[in-house]
């Protein structure tokens, strides 16, 4: 498919809403949109926000060029006045949001857009497309890193998704702690370390496994990783050490009972003097399989399909909702759906992570200035109360939303690799605040509650 502008990465109804609002005289009303998810997938204790940097780039590039306008004119859906407006469109509003790599929970307002209705409504699809995909990968990837317990993980799922999604997935995986990627485009654009040596096809190309191993070592050196399960694993390990010597970098297992094989291979390597040779496991791994292999003598994992497809939950269910807008009286009013199972809390919100010492205790999502003021009054009352627990003395609030765009201009301009490194650091710091017990396994209850009431928020530690 030919390259398309980010402006066409949208749904038609964004433009039909825009046209109808312009015709009704309401398109210029000041509006606040928020991105959030109503729930986490069952068993997920937290989510990880990824894709923010890509969203900011998409907003900056959101333009309708002449080819776009010709196509839209051919559809016959939009009138000439609307098309003329689209020709000059530039986002001129404000964006606040959670930093990329930050954790999120149900109802966390991970991104807030403020501007006119016509300014913000068109961005819904592209924002959700990026955040849902990248956060889906990051959320499961973080679980995999936890299950790996410090063993390095390589992202290697590029052959399982769309070519552009593969690059985004590698980026998201690196943010949550993956050590490297097999994807060269991610390495070139985002400076994610690239890794890879050979597949079974390389061994099968030669008349014997010995010829294949000798060719790879001659090209890559003795520190390379040899794939040893094409034929007979034990024979391949002996052959690998015979050719490379005890300084052989690593062997890779890609099939069979990885746990049992790794025990046998480790013993064999040690008996041959290759005590520093590492063992890497690949082959349809996910966080549950990695957890099962925790006691196996493995040194790292290569993870593909289950990572880049979100591990059974490809999207965290982010939605983009109008929560506040200007009325005919010129004042801002909270708005929200009341429908069953999809009700939304009106008003633009402020979010804080409540910490006791350095440990996360609650997600505070407070709607409107009145709710924030009420929380501050109640918090003060609690602090001076005779019933205040010692924990209160160690309590602080970490603001979660930061300005990203003001008046259509980026607040901070970072190159793509800098964005990714900053997000990687943010994720590591935020995850550490949860202080999860790795022995509990991947699944469990949501790590901290989301509190949306000022009085309840001030009393959550009592």
Give the residues covered by each predicted segment.
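Gly/Ser/Thr/Ala-enriched C-terminal appendages of enzymes
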Residues: 1-29, 43, 272, 277, ...
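Residues that form generic nucleotide/phosphate-binding pockets
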Residues: 55-62, 71-72, 85, 130, ...
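A residue-level signal for beta-strand positions that form part of recognition/binding surfaces
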Residues: 32-34, 92, 153, 319, ...
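Short coil/turn segments at secondary-structure boundaries
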Residues: 70-71, 139-143, 157, 439-446
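Extended boundary segments
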Residues: 20-78, 146
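Buried, small/hydrophobic-residue-enriched core segments of structured protein domains
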Residues: 1-29, 39-41, 77, 83-92, ...
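Contiguous mid-protein beta-loop-alpha structural module that forms a pocket-lining wall or clamp
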Residues: 280
């Amino acid at each position: 498919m030919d390259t398309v502008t980010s402006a066409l990465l949208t749904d038609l109804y964004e433009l039909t809403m825009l046209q109808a609002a312009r015709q009704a005289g309401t398109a210029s009303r000041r509006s606040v949109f928020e991105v959030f998810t109503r729930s986490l997938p069952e068993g997920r204790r937290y989510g990880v926000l990824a894709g923010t940097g890509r969203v900011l780039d998409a907003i900056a590039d959101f333009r309708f060029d002449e080819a776009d306008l010709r196509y839209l004119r051919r559809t016959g859906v939009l009138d000439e006045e609307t098309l003329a407006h689209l020709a000059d469109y530039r986002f001129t509003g404000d964006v606040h949001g959670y930093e990329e790599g930050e954790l999120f929970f149900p109802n966390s307002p991970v991104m807030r857009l403020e501007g006119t209705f016509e300014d913000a409504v068109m961005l819904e699809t592209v924002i959700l497309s990026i955040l849902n995909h990248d956060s889906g990968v990051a959320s499961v990837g973080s679980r995999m890193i936890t299950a790996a317990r410090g063993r390095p993980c390589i992202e290697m799922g590029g052959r399982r998704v769309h070519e552009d999604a593969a690059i985004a997935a590698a980026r998201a995986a690196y943010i949550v702690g993956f050590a490297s990627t097999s994807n060269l485009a991610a390495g070139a654009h985002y400076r994610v370390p690239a890794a890879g040596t050979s597949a079974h096809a390389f061994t099968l190309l030669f008349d014997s496994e010995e010829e294949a191993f000798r060719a790879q070592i001659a090209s890559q050196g003795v520190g390379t990783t040899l794939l040893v399960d094409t034929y007979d694993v034990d024979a391949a390990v002996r052959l690998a050490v015979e050719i490379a010597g005890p300084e052989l970098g690593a062997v890779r297992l890609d099939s069979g009972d990885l746990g049992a094989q790794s025990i046998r291979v480790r013993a064999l390597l040690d008996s041959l003097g290759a005590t520093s040779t590492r063992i890497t496991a690949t082959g349809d791994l996910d966080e549950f399989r990695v957890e099962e292999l925790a006691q196996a003598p493995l040194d790292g994992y290569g993870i593909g399909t289950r990572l880049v497809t979100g591990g059974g939950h490809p999207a965290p269910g982010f939605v983009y909702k109008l929560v506040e807008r200007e009325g005919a009286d010129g004042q801002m009013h909270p708005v929200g759906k009341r429908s069953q199972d999809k009700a939304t809390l009106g008003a633009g919100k402020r979010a804080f992570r409540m910490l006791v010492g350095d440990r996360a205790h609650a997600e505070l999502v407070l709607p409107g200035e009145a709710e924030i003021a009420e929380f501050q009054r109640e918090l003060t009352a609690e602090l001076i109360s005779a019933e205040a627990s010692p924990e209160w003395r160690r309590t602080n609030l970490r603001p979660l939303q930061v300005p990203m765009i003001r008046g259509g201009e980026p607040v901070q301009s970072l190159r793509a690799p800098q964005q990714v490194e900053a997000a990687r650091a943010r994720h590591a710091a935020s995850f550490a605040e949860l202080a999860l017990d790795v022995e509990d396994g991947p699944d469990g209850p949501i790590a901290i509650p989301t509190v949306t009431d000022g009085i309840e928020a001030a009393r959550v530690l009592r």
